[in-house]
Amino acid sequence: PIHTHHNSFISPKDSNLYIFGGYGEYHYKNDFLKLYSDESKWEKIDMKGSIPPRYLSALGIKSENSILIFGGYGHISGLQELGPYNYYDLYEADPYTGKIKKLWSLDKQEEPFVVSNAMIIDTTENLFYTLCFPNNRSNSHIVLKSFDISNGNSRTLADTIPYPFEDINAYCSLFYSKKD
């Protein structure tokens, strides 16, 4: 792919690499692509429905057939020159059937923010966790938040961490390691 800042995951179902969205050559992307692990060949996935083009969004695996995609920054046309904006919406997608469903969208936020590349999903509590940071200034900060998958209600879980946001040169992600 010619774009960066896409979301990615290794499928628990077929062990292939999937990517969504991203940014490149002054365009925001909303393609779903699959890399076959045994062939090193990319294939565009035909989705039924669409998610507006974006980057700086979070993706997490909800189940074997379901991923969640939250937030981001982009424009409905994909064109940077038309004035991008922040997204605060949550989508559920099945990369195997191509089904996409919008679960909810939050109102414009007082302080604009984008999110880390990954989210951690807790299906027992019906929450997802991601790192959030303002994308309207370079001296920024990261904060861990939880969001209710049903309605988008959020809660800040920790103090902030200083973060030098430098647009396409900035990257953060979130990982979870189960304690045995």
Predicted segment positions?
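Post-signal peptide N-terminal segment of secreted/secretory-pathway proteins
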Residues: 1-27
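Beta-propeller and closely related beta-sheet repeat lectin domains
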Residues: 4-9, 53-60, 115-120, 170-175
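Short, conserved, GDST-rich strand-edge loop motifs in beta-rich repeat architectures
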Residues: 20-24, 69-87, 129-141
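Beta-propeller blade signature
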Residues: 29-41, 82-99, 140-154
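Conserved blade-ending motifs and adjacent loop-strand segments that build the rim/top face
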Residues: 101-117, 150-178
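Intrinsically disordered, low-complexity segments enriched in Gly and acidic/Ser/Thr residues
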Residues: 120-167
